[in-house]
């Protein structure tokens, strides 16, 4: 995933994109056969990325249902995974990213959805749901909330000043130490997403991003260690505002974050021009899911909330706000035209062909990536 203005777009050319492969409280009781809990029936506990719903999304649900939504935030998929795999999280709805979602399903972390309580599933694009069914057979445990890409967001003027003739269409922009050293003067931020970023470095090195050997990971570590002195921050929650304010000039992040940053800069009338690129070497495609933890205190309310989010007007408002594509048909008339036609949100066909989906890591590989990432984060 991702974070806070209206959730963006539906899927323009969605089917074609997917064919080619183109990122708290409440009492806890045991599940009944129906999957419902005996928690506070007037409450829903939501665990989500920051900046990942429209300003009125939750308030409108509360007004419509009388259910109070308690929101908590996570900043990495690893943090979410630790909570749901440990159990007794107290959450009713969470937003995992595939392929973390696949591993969590296998571990028994989620309730099967009661689709009789989700009539708005008919509004979703079958091609998108078929794509994520590779991780969740029959879409039994989750609903697509948003999808998008990893890439590089940049402040056009600041980058041009710091690095004339910058290779904007290549990962060399941030993974080459000579370039990173020049850009350090205006600020580089990296997404705190170990498995994703490691795969992007592998792609940059011309290696298979989903079949890394121990030597491949050593090569990734070498790349990251050389650029670490020039990376100002490694934080998934700051890039939107930092880019909009001109506090940083380059960020490795999610596409929708830069749509939001661009919008905020425009609202502020500060003259900041924010661009986004999917590097020529290729990049990651991600899906964020709505799911219900197996021990959710308020599973009935969770179904109500997920169904509400799949209402066409609700999800369109979210998409228009957060700058990410949703699981509806891109032809939806409810989307802002600027979103539906935005190449940052819906990549052109030539860019679609360069996108790949992250496979699930073995426990051994996951531990190796975590160790590598911790070295990167703690080194200066």
What are these regions (language model features)?
Residues 153-158, 203-206, 286-298, 317:
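A bilobed periplasmic-binding-protein/Venus flytrap-type ligand-binding module shared by bacterial periplasmic
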Residues 111-122, 172, 268-284, 293-296:
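Short beta-strand->loop
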Residues 105-113, 131-132, 137-139, 230, ...:
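Ligand-binding "clamshell"
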Residues 189-201, 205-277:
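Ligand-binding pocket segment of bilobal, Venus flytrap-like solute-binding proteins
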Residues 293-354:
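Mature extracytoplasmic/periplasmic domains
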Residues 22-25, 30-107, 241:
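Early extracytoplasmic/lumenal segment of secretory-pathway proteins
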Residues 349-380:
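Conserved C-terminal helix/tail region of periplasmic/extracytoplasmic solute-binding proteins
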Residues 38, 102-149, 166-175:
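Hinge/lid segment of periplasmic solute-binding proteins
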């Amino acid at each position: 995933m991702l974070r806070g203005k209206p959730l963006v777009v539906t899927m323009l050319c969605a089917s074609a994109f997917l064919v080619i492969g183109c990122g708290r409280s409440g009492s806890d009781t045991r599940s009944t056969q129906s999957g419902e809990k005996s928690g506070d029936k007037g409450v829903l506990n939501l665990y989500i990325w920051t900046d990942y719903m429209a300003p009125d999304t939750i308030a409108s649900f509360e007004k419509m249902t009388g259910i109070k939504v308690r929101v908590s935030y996570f900043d990495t998929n690893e943090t979410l995974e630790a909570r749901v795999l440990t159990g007794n999280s107290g959450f009713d709805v969470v937003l995992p990213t595939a392929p973390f979602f696949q591993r969590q399903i296998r571990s028994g972390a989620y309730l099967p959805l009661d689709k009789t309580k989700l009539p708005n599933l008919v509004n979703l694009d079958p091609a998108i749901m078929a794509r994520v069914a590779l991780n969740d057979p029959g879409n039994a445990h989750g609903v697509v909330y948003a999808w998008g890409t990893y890439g590089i967001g940049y402040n056009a003027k600041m980058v041009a000043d710091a690095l004339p003739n910058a290779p904007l269409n290549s990962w060399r922009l941030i993974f080459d130490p000579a370039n990173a050293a020049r850009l350090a003067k205006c600020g580089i931020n990296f997404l705190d997403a170990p498995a994703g970023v490691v795969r992007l470095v592998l792609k940059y090195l011309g290696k298979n991003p989903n079949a890394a050997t121990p030597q491949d990971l050593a090569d990734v570590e070498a790349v990251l260690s050389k650029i670490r002195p020039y990376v100002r921050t490694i934080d998934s929650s700051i890039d939107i505002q930092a880019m909009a304010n001109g506090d940083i000039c380059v960020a490795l992040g999610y596409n929708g974050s830069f749509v939001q940053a661009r919008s905020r800069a425009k609202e502020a009338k500060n003259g900041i021009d924010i661009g986004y690129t999917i590097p020529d070497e290729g990049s990651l495609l991600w899906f964020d899911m709505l799911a219900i933890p197996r021990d959710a205190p308020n599973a009935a309310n969770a179904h109500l909330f997920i169904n509400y989010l799949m209402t066409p007007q609700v999800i369109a408002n979210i998409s228009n706000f957060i700058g990410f594509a949703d699981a509806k048909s891109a032809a939806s008339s409810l989307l802002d035209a600027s979103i539906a036609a935005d190449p940052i949100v819906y990549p052109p066909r030539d860019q679609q062909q360069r996108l790949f989906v992250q496979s699930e890591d073995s426990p051994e590989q996951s531990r190796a990536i975590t160790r590598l990432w911790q070295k990167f984060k703690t080194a200066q």
